[in-house]
C-alpha cells in the first residue's frame, strides 16, 4: 500500500468527514460519509449524538445545524447529487449581482435530482455544458452569463438591465460571455430581451443612478460612452463614471 493510501485509511473516519465538510461549508452527502468509512449504523449513531444534523434527504450538516446562505446553497446542490449546480437566482446571488430574497434555492441537474422539495427547486437541462459551470465560494454554480439568462424571465426589463450591468461591474460576466450563452440559448423565452441589453455595449455600472444617466444619454442619441473604465492622467489613475474618448 502506498503512503497516500496508508495515510487515508489510518485517519479516523470523523477526521475524514470533517475534512470533506470543511470544503463544503460544513455540509456532506451520505455517499461521502460512506466514502469516509461510516456505514448507516454509524451515521445513525452520530445523528443521535448530535454530531450530524439532517439538512435535506441524504445531506447532513456536520457539528451544528447553523447555516449561512452559502451553506444552505451548498446543501441544496449536494441534495441534487453528482453534477448538480446552483443556478438561477441562487447562482446570481453567489456571483454578487442579485440580492437574495429567501426564495427556494434553484439547482440545475442534467438528469435525476428528484422532485423539488421544501427549500429547493430542481431544474433539468440537457443544454447545460461544461463551459456554463464554475465554482463560486467553493460551490458548483452556473456561470454569471448563464445565470443572467436563467433569471431574465423573472425580471422586468429595467431590473434585468441593472443585473447585466452589475454583473459586468463585478467582473462576473462580460458582454462576450453573455453573447455566447445567447447563441446557444435555443429559443429561450428571454433571449430577445437579454440580447437587446447586450447590444447596447459594455456598461459596468455600480448604481441605479449611473444606469439612469446612461439611459437618458443613450435615449437622447449620444454615443455610448466608456463606463467606469480606467483613465491614467497626469500620473494618477481615475475611473470616470462616463467618458467619451477624444477622436480624430
Where would I find each of the regions flagged by the language model?
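A short, surface-exposed helix-loop junction/capping segment
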Residues: 190-201
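Short gly/ser-rich loop at a beta-strand->alpha-helix junction or flexible surface loop bordering the NTP-binding
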Residues: 1-192, 208, 226
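Active-site metal-binding core of divalent-cation-utilizing nuclease and nuclease-like domains
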Residues: 113-117, 130, 222-247
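Acidic-basic catalytic patches of nuclease active cores, encompassing PD-(D/E)XK
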Residues: 200-225
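Conserved short-loop catalytic and cofactor-binding motifs
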Residues: 21, 201, 230
Amino acid at each position: 500500500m502506498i503512503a497516500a493510501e496508508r495515510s487515508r485509511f489510518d485517519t479516523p473516519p470523523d477526521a475524514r468527514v470533517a475534512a470533506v465538510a470543511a470544503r463544503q461549508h460544513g455540509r456532506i452527502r451520505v455517499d461521502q460519509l460512506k466514502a469516509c468509512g461510516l456505514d448507516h449504523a454509524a451515521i445513525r449513531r452520530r445523528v443521535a449524538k448530535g454530531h450530524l444534523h439532517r439538512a435535506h434527504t441524504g445531506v447532513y450538516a456536520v457539528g451544528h445545524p447553523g447555516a449561512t446562505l452559502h451553506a444552505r446553497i451548498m446543501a441544496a446542490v449536494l441534495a441534487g447529487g453528482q453534477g448538480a449546480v446552483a443556478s438561477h437566482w441562487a447562482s446570481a446571488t453567489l456571483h454578487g449581482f442579485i440580492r437574495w430574497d429567501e426564495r427556494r434555492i434553484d439547482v440545475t441537474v442534467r438528469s435525476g435530482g428528484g422532485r423539488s422539495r421544501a427549500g429547493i427547486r430542481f431544474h433539468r437541462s440537457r443544454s447545460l455544458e461544461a463551459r456554463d459551470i464554475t465554482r463560486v465560494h467553493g460551490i458548483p454554480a452556473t456561470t454569471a452569463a448563464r445565470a443572467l439568462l436563467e433569471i431574465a424571465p423573472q425580471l422586468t426589463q429595467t431590473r434585468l438591465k441593472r443585473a447585466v450591468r452589475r454583473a459586468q461591474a463585478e467582473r462576473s460576466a462580460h458582454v462576450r460571455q453573455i453573447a455566447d450563452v445567447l447563441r446557444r440559448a435555443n429559443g429561450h423565452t428571454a433571449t430577445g430581451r437579454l440580447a437587446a441589453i447586450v447590444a447596447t455595449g459594455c456598461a459596468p455600472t455600480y448604481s441605479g443612478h449611473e444606469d439612469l444617466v446612461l439611459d437618458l444619454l443613450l435615449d437622447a442619441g449620444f454615443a455610448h460612452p466608456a463606463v467606469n473604465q480606467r483613465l491614467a492622467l497626469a500620473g494618477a489613475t481615475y475611473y470616470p463614471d462616463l467618458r467619451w474618448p477624444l477622436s480624430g
